[in-house]
Regions:
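An alpha-beta-alpha
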Residues: 83-84, 91, 102-103, 194-244, ...
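Flexible loop/hinge segments that line or gate small-molecule binding clefts
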Residues: 153-191, 209, 303-315
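Hydrophobic alpha-helical segments within soluble ligand-binding/sensing domains
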Residues: 49, 61-70, 131, 185-210, ...
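Extracytoplasmic "Venus flytrap"
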Residues: 37-43, 54, 58-105, 109, ...
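Short beta-strand elements at the ligand-binding edges of bilobed clamshell
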Residues: 123, 177-199, 212-216, 244, ...
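Hinge/cleft segment of the Venus flytrap/periplasmic-binding protein
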Residues: 35-81, 232-233, 328-408
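Short beta-strand elements in bilobed, periplasmic/extracellular small-molecule ligand-binding domains
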Residues: 109-124, 209-212, 233-251
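Hydrophobic alpha-helical
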Residues: 136-138, 144-164, 229, 247-309, ...
């Protein structure tokens, strides 16, 4: 995961090209950052990250800040907590699953006497100024925990600081904010690109042409993922990125862009690195052009992709990251915080499960079709074990216990 990120079945209505300038759909926040940190600065920053998690922090500066000991002077409110969700867009199934999971987790805490029973939800529909107003209102109205899918890395910072000063916990779900008063729980887009470059090079034996199928131009996810892939591929002289396209996380748009590219580029294409919801459209474009379907990699585990994968016997992989499991993953660190535990860093990056040919049948169901709108989450819905987050916290009391629920 890091956008409307909304990895989901989505985008027919959400991410049109006209909306590209204001909605950040699967990838989230617009890219805006300073120069790359020096090796010394990187080493200093990573020294605060648990050793076993540092491998997931490559290129961390593309996704946001990593601040050491950011909540040293912060104290949580006592239960029962009012849990709230501040969202930038609620127009697709990925976000719907996210909210459904948060509602289920809130009920579990309420049943234990630790929370009020209803999750308070706001939706700014892509308007960052409205989202900020909604955030400030949530703080004023007594929210104790605010989970959020922010529409900007910086646009909510005044509200997040206000929350921090009033003892309200703000947790950004897979769309990091730069303000140190918020806790980010996310996947690292640079790492996804790096992994993709290494995997593709291995499948092609170090020789072949690659197309990058991006989502929206200019978002942090877009820049980080493509940079991670390009820097990895550049280390192998037989590999070449021959195209960088933008499909707006929408299969039909991706198909159209690939068709246009193939019409003017007759050279063989060995692989397409797709960044969300576009794998089927990419493959169909090659078929329509009379070209062999290349290796296709993905970052969203749509059932439609697995059906197409099965039908065409693809060489492929996809990350697993539905909205419900992502919400649960972000909620666990929030519970650590509400138990008085202190996070070592402001941004917690986590790995994701990966579907390959080796474990394909653990996720595929015969009922899946190319028209399916579900996510292939498998039997174990956890993206990482709950214990993964233990290494990021010190002190405090044991956290409250909750269980992940299926929302897909």
């Amino acid at each position: 995961m890091i956008a409307c990120k909304d990895r989901a079945t989505l985008a027919r209505r959400v991410c049109t090209l006209a909306a590209a300038v204001t909605l950040f759909c699967l990838g989230g926040v617009a890219a805006s950052r300073a120069a790359d940190p020096s090796p010394e600065e990187q080493k200093k920053t990573l020294s605060a990250v648990p050793a076993d998690a540092q491998k997931y922090y490559g290129g961390y500066w593309y996704a946001g800040n990593v601040v050491a000991d950011p909540f040293a002077d912060w104290k949580p409110h006592p239960p029962p907590w009012q849990i709230c969700h501040n969202d930038s867009y609620l127009g697709n199934s990925w976000r719907a699953n996210l909210v459904a999971e948060l509602k289920a987790l809130t009920k579990q805490l309420a049943d234990q006497g630790l929370a009020k029973p209803d999750l308070i939800v706001t939706n700014s529909n892509g308007d960052i100024n409205l989202e900020l107003s909604q955030l400030k209102a949530q703080v004023a109205q007594g929210c104790d925990i605010i989970m959020s899918y922010p529409g900007s890395a910086t646009g909510l910072c005044s509200g997040i600081k206000d929350a921090y000063n009033k003892g309200v916990l703000f947790v950004a779900i897979d769309s990091p904010v730069t303000c140190p008063e918020g806790l980010n729980v996310a996947t690292n887009p640079y790492y996804r690109g790096q992994f993709g470059g290494e995997w593709i090079a291995k499948q092609l034996n170090g020789k072949g042409n690659v197309i990058v199928m991006n989502g929206q131009p200019g978002t942090a996810n877009t820049v980080a993922q493509e940079t991670g892939l390009r820097q990895t591929v550049a280390s192998d002289p037989g590999m070449k990125v021959v195209g960088s396209l933008f499909g707006m996380w929408t299969g039909s748009v991706a198909k159209s862009e690939v068709l246009k590219f193939l019409a003017t580029h007759p050279e063989p294409v060995g692989a397409v690195f797709s960044t969300g919801n576009m794998g089927v459209g990419v493959g169909q474009a090659f078929e329509q052009s009379g070209r062999p379907v290349p290796i296709i990699t993905e970052v969203t585990n749509l059932c439609s992709l697995l059906a197409y994968w099965k039908e065409k016997n693809l060489t492929a992989y996809t990350f697993v990251q539905d909205g419900g499991p992502m919400a649960y993953a972000a909620f666990i660190p929030a519970l650590h915080m509400m138990a008085g535990q202190k996070p070592k860093v402001s941004t917690i990056f986590m790995p994701l499960p990966i579907i390959t040919s080796d474990n394909f049948n653990d996720y595929y169901e015969p009922s899946m079709t190319v028209q399916s709108t579900c996510f292939a989450n498998g039997k174990d819905l956890h993206l990482v074990p709950d214990e993964y987050f233990d290494q990021f916290f010190t002190g405090g009391q044991p956290r409250a216990q909750v269980k992940i629920v299926p929302t897909n």
